[in-house]
From Swiss-Prot:
Region (Disordered): 1-84, 1055-1096, 1129-1148
Modified residues (Phosphoserine): 24, 756, 1062, 1065, 1093
Domain SCD: 296-381
Bias kind Basic and acidic residues: ranges: 53-62, 1137-1146
Top-rank taxon: Eukaryota
Function: Component of cohesin complex, a complex required for the cohesion of sister chromatids after DNA replication. The cohesin complex apparently forms a large proteinaceous ring within which sister chromatids can be trapped. At anaphase, the complex is cleaved and dissociates from chromatin, allowing sister chromatids to segregate. The cohesin complex may also play a role in spindle pole assembly during mitosis.
Comp. bias regions, Polar residues: 10-19
Name the UniProt record assigns to this protein: Cohesin subunit SA-1
Start-end of Basic residues biased regions: 1076-1087
Subcellular location: Nucleus; Chromosome; Chromosome, Centromere
Keyword Ribonucleoprotein: no
Pfam families: HEAT_SCC3-SA, SCD, STAG
Length: 1258
């Protein structure tokens, strides 16, 4: 009996009004007319159906025939009039109102309950996707288990889908209709039919049996039905409880009347009504008890995540709907345990269920023990690897904070605080909401009302802004102010837009008794203020958050315009004052100068505010003259560029001010250069500083402004030539002169490309570029590293800009400006990369120790080296530098993988797209270089087991993996690689005689790593080519020094069948792993092999480039555990060592000439192909027959297994290991709590009860 464990169902004092469908009271006629129940405490039978009388047989058979005419697996069958004939069809189509459908069924039940019940049984069977139909003989003579076993045999084994999992809007609608049908059915039957001890016993017994099936479709569908059935029963129980309370109050009121006014008949009637309600409630509790213990406690830990999620979602509904009965530790423990589920969707349902409870503050006392027990787990879930779960966990923690601030410790809050800096915006916004609730919510209404009358620094926002600044400084993430502002934007927008208060805090002196802001606090406030201005003006998240700019709605657009006007009108006046106050502080000025780019500059004219523009220009000029820091100068230059925009009327005024400023600096620069060059080595520090400071300012302005009319290139070139010839020029001057000259050349190129240049203009620019490239090349040998790095970067940039691509887009007239680097320059660039990028870690550490630089400087140095490598790699990718130069880069792939692995891999991928053959030659060349270096270090007698040899072999293995799975596509490239490798191995003869191995013979062991990428017929051809270099003596040798040759030969003559199958897999598409494939589609590899031209030679191949076709998307990884593919298995087999290459897949081109002759005849090839395919079809059929639809429910099943490399498998294992298990470990504080009350959350109790729990639930 439920009543023993849930006294609240008996003693409920809930005074909430009843639901509209139940009414305030039960009709007396319904109470009196209800038939007597035999054994109200008897749970429904789960084994045997009630027997039917012989007289009912014909009627039942007629009903079964009517109910069974529809097909189950989603294909409706209609009668002659086009109307659906089964409940399944009616619910699936959803054309009729659900209440009318249920009313029709109830009417049928009243006429003949067996026919109606059988229709309902077949409804659940068909909703599971089963083709079978329960017949009268089965219904009468077989137990539930036998019926379910019979229905299991009727499933369509070719498909793993069933209505609840089928895609498409129709089936999504079906799920909602299915749930609605169950709810309406119980609601309409709640006054009579559900108490007849027949309907509910039969339905619950069937659903209990189906939920214990090994067939996923049965288990999933019946669990959903049972949980929705339970939810409807909970609603009925709640209504009964309310009616009981009302009846009890009426009875007490009548009994308390004076004897003369008391109506005894009414007292008896109320007493009888109360008794009937209690009996009904006992009956409902028995039903809920059967569903909960028979279904929920087993299925909430089902192997299928969707089933577990259904259980948790519904128990949350029960606890919220009927909190007096269900919101206690006996039920909450299931949600708490499932917080550790390994699947994110289940954890998400747990959090959603808890959110609905914590939203109601009246329920907090009942949640106190649960909060104490699972608070740590909930807080830790804010760092969940699935962002959706993390967001909901943060929202739940916010609700807990809102209900009781004492529930969370300072440490718990700090764990959420730092998430405002998360790159994932929903997580950050949720954390911002938490931060707003904790720090910025005002809780004193009187103080708020008093402060609301004040404005500026004394307004309510004044203290909150100070608090925000302190939080920002304490977080020690000062480069992420934009992220902090974005996180708080939705919850604290009013505070963040109070720019008046911010500027008053910065400009006004503190009043007496008020603590002044420190320099750090002022800098932080300025940075935050600029970020709020950007957020308001642009109305989209900062870089790194979100996928890009979205289209604003009309309301958002209006808000953006209003905010932009508001900030413009305010800062047009206050910005000059802020610049004046903080003009000496470079960091503050650089931030303040970001503000004008967000102005609506039209307001200067429309608002008659030109005087404020003059004040701003005056302050900017003062800042330029005062500072030489690059950040400040670039900010000033950008501000001038924005104010000079041609679409605004203020452009002329700003252009005049800018020209005057540039004139002054150019005159000063020309005079200081003359003084410096005249004095030569005798120049003092003042002369050097004058040149350097002025040149820095001009370089910063030249970046954003066309200063070619001032001819800065001439003096810069003079400084560079003097530095090269005499070597006494300071490195900073050289660096700035190089950069300024570079900008000058680019602006000249812009003029030429935008206009109609004459031949003379082209020749002048060509001469300028040629002379500057020569200077940069000479600077590569400079003793100062910054000079060399700057020269290298500018060389790479200019070679890219003035390459053959300059003529694309109809600009053939610019051909005189194209520069192709000669061999000497290419060698110098490559040597620079080798010397400055691929440096040993020890050398780097020593240099860092000598300069006393910290970890941040190491990261900065690595960033510079990565830029150098990327600049040179672009020259290779765009065919400006010969591809063979990449060999020196590829050979460092393993050693410097952590630092440059992504750059090198991308370079390899792009070069392969340019020319597969040449790329393969480059790869083998890089391995040959490493081998030669090793021979020079250790001599010709290499130790094959040494780490150096193993490293080369590992690098070769990695290179082999990059060729991908499609061996036909890479066939000629791999063949060429083997050809070059063999020639290298036998290039030199041993000076001691032919009986000794060639010096490079050990290289064959490295080459054998690529043998798995050869086709079967190509292995024979390569073997034949190898034998041309072998003598009879070599073939007979078995000494250790000849083992590389033996190993390589073995790799070419073994594995034929495996390679044959790998060809098939390489030609298959990504659709081979799908659940269902189109019938009759021929295997792709057969078609390709038949179309292949196999009569071309490879031995005499020339090195002509073969352009590859365009890329196609790489095949997707799909699940193959539970749902086998109906296509031949030959299309799915892949080599164990293969992985998806970095190169995208290409369409096979039958016209491409494939070399390597000596292949088997085409007829023999096709015959073996057909034999292999027939065998695979047999294997596939056997797998389908054995597989069936059975599943074990002991452990969750992971389906994603098509991983193609060891690293991917390791990543998958790590992902599974760090997910959460369902069961909690024993609590550390269980002993203390056990003295006070039982610990309902102890997951160790799971093993103590056959139902899964150590304590009786009911």
């Amino acid at each position: 009996m439920i009543t023993s464990e849930l006294p609240v169902l008996q003693d409920s004092t809930n005074e909430t009004t009843a639901h509209s469908d139940a009414g305030s009271e039960l009709e007396e006629t319904e109470v009196k007319g209800k038939r007597k129940r035999g054994r109200p405490g008897r749970p429904p039978s789960t084994n045997k159906k009630p027997r039917k009388s012989p007289g009912e047989k014909s009627r039942i058979e007629a009903g079964i025939r009517g109910a069974g005419r529809g097909r189950a697996n989603g294909h409706p069958q209609q009668n002659g009039e086009g109307e659906p004939v089964t409940l399944f069809e009616v619910v699936k189509l959803g054309k009729s109102a659900m209440q009318s459908v249920v009313d029709d069924w109830i009417e049928s039940y009243k006429q003949d309950r067996d026919i109606a019940l059988l229709d309902l049984i077949n409804f659940f069977i068909q909703c599971s996707g089963c083709r079978g139909t329960v017949r009268i003989e089965m219904f009468r003579n077989m137990q539930n288990a036998e019926i379910i076993r019979k229905m299991t045999e009727e499933f369509d084994e070719d498909s793993g889908d069933y209505p609840l999992t089928m895609p498409g809007p129709q089936w999504k609608k079906f799920r909602s209709n299915f749930c609605e049908f169950i709810g309406v059915l119980i609601r309409q039957c709640q006054y009579s039919i559900i108490y007849d001890e027949y309907m509910m016993d039969t339905v619950i017994s069937l659903l209990t049996g189906l939920s214990d099936s090994q067939v996923r479709a049965f288990r999933h569908t019946s669990t959903l039905a049972a949980m929705k059935l339970m939810t409807a029963l909970v609603n009925v129980a709640l209504n009964l409880s309310i009616h009981q309370d009302n009846t009890q109050r009426q009875y007490e009121a009548e009994r308390n009347k004076m004897i003369g006014k008391r109506a005894n008949e009414r007292l008896e009637l109320l007493l009888q009504k109360r008794k009937e309600l209690q009996e009904n409630q006992d009956e409902i509790e028995n039903m809920m008890n059967s569903i909960f213990k028979g279904i929920f406690v087993h299925r909430y830990r089902d192997a299928i995540a969707e089933i577990r999620a259904i259980c948790i979602e519904e128990i949350g509904v029960w606890m919220k709907m009927y909190s007096d009965a269900f919101l206690n530790d006996s039920y909450l423990k299931y949600v708490g345990w499932t917080l550790h589920d390994r699947q994110g969707e289940v954890r998400l349902k747990c959090l959603k269920a808890l959110q609905s409870l914590y939203t109601n503050r009246e329920l907090f006392p009942k949640l106190e023990l649960f909060t104490n027990r699972f608070k740590d787990r909930i807080v830790s879930m804010t760092l969940d690897k699935e962002y959706d779960v993390a967001v909901e966990a943060i929202r739940l923690v916010t609700l807990i904070l809102h209900g009781s601030e004492e529930a969370l410790s300072n440490e718990d809050c700090e764990n959420v605080y730092h998430l405002v800096y998360s790159a994932h915006r929903p997580v950050a916004v949720a954390a911002g909401e938490f931060l707003h609730k904790k720090l910025f919510s005002r809780h004193d209404p009187q103080a708020e009302e008093a402060l609301a009358k004040r404005r500026g620094r004394n307004s309510p926002n004044g203290n909150l802004i100070r608090m925000l600044v302190l939080f920002f400084l304490e977080s020690e993430l000062h480069e992420h102010a934009a992220y902090l502002v974005d996180s708080l934007w939705e919850s604290s927008q009013e505070l963040l837009k109070d720019w008046e208060c911010m500027t008053e805090l910065l400009l006004e002196e503190p009043v007496q008794g008020e603590e002044a802001m420190s320099d750090r606090q002022e800098s932080a406030l300025i940075e935050l203020m600029v970020c709020t201005i950007r957020q308001a003006a642009e109305a989209h998240p900062p870089v790194g958050r979100g996928t890009g700019k979205r289209v604003l709605t009309a309301k958002e657009r209006k808000t953006q315009i209003d905010d932009r006007n508001k900030l413009t009108e305010h800062f047009i006046i206050t910005l000059p004052m802020l610049l004046s106050k903080y003009s000496a502080d470079a960091e503050k000025v650089a931030n303040l100068l970001q503000i004008p780019q967000y102005f609506d500059l039209e307001i200067y004219s429309t608002g008659r505010m030109e005087k404020h523009l003059d004040a701003l220009l005056k302050q900017i000029k003062f800042v330029v003259e005062k500072h030489v820091e690059s950040d400040v100068l670039e900010a000033c230059s950008k501000t001038y560029s924005i104010l000079c925009s041609e679409e605004y009327t203020i452009q002329n005024r700003v252009d005049i001010a800018r020209s005057q400023l540039i004139d002054e600096f150019v005159d000063r620069f020309n005079h200081s250069v003359e003084d410096l060059l005249q004095e030569g080595e005798e120049a003092d520090d003042d002369d050097i500083y004058n040149v350097l400071s002025t040149l820095k300012r001009l370089t910063s302005f030249h970046n954003a402004h066309d200063l070619t009319k001032w001819d800065l290139f001439g003096n810069c070139y003079r400084l560079l030539k003097t530095g090269i010839e005499h070597g006494a020029m300071p490195e900073q001057i050289v660096v700035q002169a190089l950069q300024c000259s570079h900008y000058s050349i680019l602006w000249q190129l812009v003029k030429i490309t935008d206009g109609s240049p004459s031949k003379e203009d082209l020749l002048v620019l060509r001469k300028t570029v040629k002379s500057f490239l020569a200077v940069c090349q000479q600077c590569l040998s400079n003793v100062n590293t910054p000079v060399k790095e700057q020269a290298f970067m500018l060389l790479c940039d200019l070679l890219m800009i003035f390459s053959h691509q300059l003529m694309t887009g109809g600009r053939e007239g610019l051909q005189p400006l194209v520069f192709n680097p000669d061999t000497g320059l290419q060698s110098e660039l490559l040597s620079f990369v080798m010397d400055h990028v691929f440096i040993d870690q020890d050398e780097e550490n020593q240099s860092m120790e000598g300069d006393e630089e910290d970890e941040a400087n190491k990261i900065e140095a690595l960033h510079k080296r990565r830029n150098l490598l990327a600049a040179f790699s672009k020259l290779i990718i765009y065919d400006i530098v010969d591809m063979h130069a990449a060999a020196d880069i590829f050979k460092h792939y393993m050693k410097y993988y952590n630092d440059y692995g992504d750059i090198i891999k991308e370079t390899l991928s792009k070069t392969r797209q340019i020319d597969k053959i040449q790329c393969a030659k480059t790869l083998i060349l890089s391995l040959q270089q490493l081998f030669n270096e090793l021979v020079q270090e250790q001599g010709p007698n290499l130790d094959r087991t040494s780490a150096h040899v193993s490293g080369i072999k590992e690098l070769a293995r990695r290179f082999a993996l990059t060729f991908g799975l499609d061996q036909i596509k890479t066939r000629e490239a791999v063949a060429t690689l083997h050809k070059d490798g063999i020639e290298f191995a036998f290039k030199y003869q041993n000076q001691k005689g032919q009986e000794y191995p060639p010096p490079n013979l050990a290289f064959l062991e490295v080459l054998s790593e690529f043998s798995s990428k050869l086709l079967r017929q190509d292995k024979k051809t390569v073997h034949s080519y190898l034998e041309k270099f072998l003598t009879e003596q070599m073939m007979e040798r078995r000494e250790d020094v000849w083992l590389p040759l033996i190993s390589y030969r073995n790799s070419l003559v073994t594995g034929g069948e495996d390679d044959r199958m790998s060809v098939n897999s390489g030609s298959s598409s990504s659709k081979t792993s799908s659940v269902r494939n189109k019938k009759g589609r021929p295997p792709l590899h057969k078609k390709r092999v038949e179309d292949e031209s196999l009569d071309n030679t490879w031995l005499n191949r020339t090195d002509t480039m073969i352009q590859t076709p365009g890329p196609l998307p790489a095949p997707q990884l799909t699940s193959t555990v539970l749902r086998e593919n109906s296509r031949p298995m030959g299309d799915q087999i892949q080599e164990p060592e293969s992985e998806h290459g970095s190169e995208p897949d290409f369409l096979h081109n039958p016209q491409m000439q494939i070399s390597w002759l000596g292949q088997p005849k085409l007829e023999d090839l096709n015959r073996k192909d057909r034999t292999g395919m027939n065998y695979m079809k047999v294997r596939t059929g056997v797998r389908h027959a054995v597989r069936g639809l059975m599943e074990e429910d002991a452990e969750p099943i992971f389906e994603d297994v098509m991983m193609s490399s060891r690293s991917q498998l390791e990543d998958m294992n790590e992902e599974f290991e760090d997910t959460m298990v369902i069961d909690l470990p024993p609590s550390r504080n269980r002993r203390e709590r056990a003295e006070l009350r039982p610990d309902f959350f102890d997951s160790a109790a799971i093993i103590e009860d056959d139902s899964g729990f150590g304590m009786p639930m009911f």
